[in-house]
A protein has these predicted regions:
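Alpha-helical solenoid repeat scaffolds of the TPR/TPR-like class and their adjacent stem/linker regions
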Residues: 1-198
Length: 198
């Protein structure tokens, strides 16, 4: 990534990937872990400063492309690093939301007193997948249907028997390949009370 950055120093994408790639899959020593976490923190700080107002549009194209997935596997409190990463993502996507004129989801939805709570599940893993198998299937199947209404937004067209189960369990099921703005509007217009992104 350093070579790519040297060839294109204004690329948000290269710098984003370089920051994330401070985290390795395997470490030989505890010192290697500490060095990696420190490198990630330093590069996140640089990335935060690099993403100026002029670079927010490009950054919006990069959010979610690579994520600090392996950070969850460290047996160390990494809340600070996840918050720092999350702040960058939130700032970038807030800009995207304002630019695309997508109104924020209502913090207080209009529902009748005693009405069901609408739970929106937004995921690309509504199928046989570790996310579905480990916990999401249990959430979908076991939410009390007297109190909760499940809305599923499957962010792709992948279908299997587990997808069919989700379709029959949810009150509303939406799936397909759509752009970010289309999904954002569909989710907003559903007037869900809770958004869950597994």
């Amino acid at each position: 990534f350093l070579r790519a950055i040297s060839l294109n120093p204004d690329s948000v994408s290269f710098r984003w990937d370089f920051s994330i790639n401070q985290l390795s899959k395997v470490y030989l020593t505890y010192d290697d872990i500490k060095k990696s976490l420190h490198g990630f923190e330093v590069e996140l700080t640089k990335l935060q400063e690099f993403i100026t107002a002029e670079r927010l549009d490009e950054a919006a194209e990069v959010v979610g492309k690579s994520q600090p997935y392996y950070l969850a596997y460290f047996e160390i409190d990494n809340k600070f690093l996840l918050e720092k990463y999350g702040e960058i993502c939130c700032r970038v996507m807030k800009h995207w939301q304002e630019k695309n004129l997508i109104a924020p989801v209502n913090s207080i939805t209009k529902r009748n007193a005693g009405g069901k709570i609408k739970v929106g599940i937004v995921s690309a893993h509504i199928r046989y997948h570790s996310v579905w198998n480990a916990f999401l299937k249990g959430v979908v199947k076991n939410l009390d249907s007297e109190k909760f209404e499940v809305h599923i937004f499957a962010l792709n067209d992948k279908v299997d028997n587990e997808t069919e189960l989700a379709k029959t369990t949810a009150k509303y099921f939406n799936a397909g390949e759509r752009g970010l703005a289309q999904w954002a509007n569909k989710i907003r217009n559903s007037e869900i009370d809770i958004a869950f992104y597994p």
